[in-house]
UniProtKB/Swiss-Prot annotation:
Specifically methylates the guanine in position 1207 of 16S rRNA in the 30S particle. Keywords: Cytoplasm, Methyltransferase, rRNA processing, S-adenosyl-L-methionine, Transferase. GO terms for cellular component: cytoplasm. Its EC number is 2.1.1.172. InterPro entries: DNA_methylase_N6_adenine_CS (IPR002052), Mtase_sm_N (IPR013675), rRNA_ssu_MeTfrase_C (IPR023543), RsmC/RlmG (IPR046977), SAM-dependent_MTases_sf (IPR029063), Small_mtfrase_dom (IPR007848). This is Ribosomal RNA small subunit methyltransferase C. It catalyses: guanosine(1207) in 16S rRNA + S-adenosyl-L-methionine = N(2)-methylguanosine(1207) in 16S rRNA + S-adenosyl-L-homocysteine + H(+). GO terms for molecular function: 16S rRNA (guanine(1207)-N(2))-methyltransferase activity; nucleic acid binding. The keyword Zinc does not apply. Belongs to the methyltransferase superfamily. RsmC family. The keyword Cytoplasm applies. It comes from Shewanella pealeana (strain ATCC 700345 / ANG-SQ1). HAMAP family: 16SrRNA_methyltr_C. Monomer.
Length: 341
């Protein structure tokens, strides 16, 4: 099943007839493969690891697939398709990345949902692109095209980075935040409660949904001998976490994982401010699987320590997989669940 934006792209696939195409920030479907019916070759760069895993089985000589915040080569394409990102701050980065990989006068195609901010695209396109032209408006989405009219500035990661000092209960740490990664430049309420009620951890610890590495940095500030692994599904988050570790002189293993599927060991501790907050049925299922997988990936005596919105139904699942529920602390918004396996 194609997303709405992908359906609009596919019905305009004559725009890429016999062309080499790069698809940036593709969604949870098989659109890159579908484009091969008209395009001569397709390369996809996913910023979401789950999206990458969905497409990976279809990789072929004319369909190359990558996960990350940049491509591993400087290859240039006839057309670059950009899915307008849900995090609007990421859009200028993607346009710069698109320009880097476009041939002179190459075609830019941008598709996105009306409610996601795509309507303002003509004002957002940088000057090295021509004025955006609206080609289609369907499925609550808009499709724009443009053309590269001059070379773009060199893409330097430091130009897209926010770096700031953060006070935590464990001490002050430096946080490096790339565009599109959640940040308030201060401790969000949930993480504040989590770190204010941090038990002493030991051995191998997993920071699930690490984001820019706030929890990891605080942990290592207090306990530099911990062996930490940091996982996230988002390429910009993983790059941010690596930069945060470097800025503080800390060491941890950072890698992409869809849930806990790509982890390969059992842990002495799992800590998280999990990125499931909206209470939708799909979110609840993901949260349930996270608790179950955490129990399966903890050693006997291992600690499961998370913060969650108090309205999310964690208690029953934790009781099922850990035998009991221990709420270590709570306020009017959040609960700290801290359970030993």
């Amino acid at each position: 099943m194609l997303t709405n934006a992908s359906q609009v792209l596919l019905r305009n696939s004559d725009l890429v007839k016999d062309q080499s195409v790069l698809v940036l920030n593709y969604e949870s479907d098989h659109l890159p493969k579908e484009l091969l019916a008209t395009a001569s070759s397709v390369c996809g760069l996913a910023l979401d690891y789950h999206h990458h895993l969905m497409m990976q089985p279809y990789a072929a000589a004319n369909l190359t697939l990558h996960f990350g915040h940049q491509l591993p080569t400087d290859e240039c394409f006839d057309t670059v398709i950009v899915y307008f990102p849900k995090a609007k701050a990421l859009a200028p980065y993607l346009f710069n990345l698109a320009a880097k990989h476009l041939k002179p006068q190459g075609q830019l195609i941008v598709a996105g949902e009306n409610k996601g901010g795509i309507k303002s695209l003509p004002k957002q396109l940088p000057s090295y692109f021509d004025k955006a032209f609206k080609v289609d408006n369907a499925r609550h989405c808009i499709l724009f095209t443009s053309e590269l009219n001059s070379p773009a500035p060199e893409l330097k990661l430091k130009d897209w980075l926010s770096r700031y000092q953060l006070d935590t209960p464990q001490g002050q740490v430096t946080i490096c935040n790339l565009v599109g990664v959640f940040s308030e430049k201060k401790l969000d309420e949930g993480t504040q409660l989590l770190l204010a009620n941090l038990p002493k951890m030991s051995g191998n610890v997993l920071d699930f949904g690490c984001g820019a590495g706030v929890i990891t940095a605080a942990l290592l500030k207090a306990q530099p001998d911990l062996k930490l692994e940091c996982v996230d599904i988002n390429a910009m988050a993983l790059a941010s976490c690596e930069l945060t570790l470097e800025a503080n002189g800390f060491t941890a293993k950072v890698f992409a994982s869809d849930g806990l599927a790509q982890t390969s060991q059992r842990y002495d501790g799992i800590i998280s401010n999990p990125p499931f907050h909206d209470g939708l049925a799909s979110t609840t299922n993901i949260a349930t699987n996270f608790v179950k997988d955490s129990a399966n990936n903890l050693k006997a005596g291992g600690l499961f320590h998370i913060v969650a919105n108090r309205h999310l139904p964690y208690s029953d699942t934790i009781a099922e997989h850990f035998g009991s529920v221990n709420v270590l602390a709570e306020n009017n918004k959040y609960k700290i669940y801290s359970n030993v396996k």
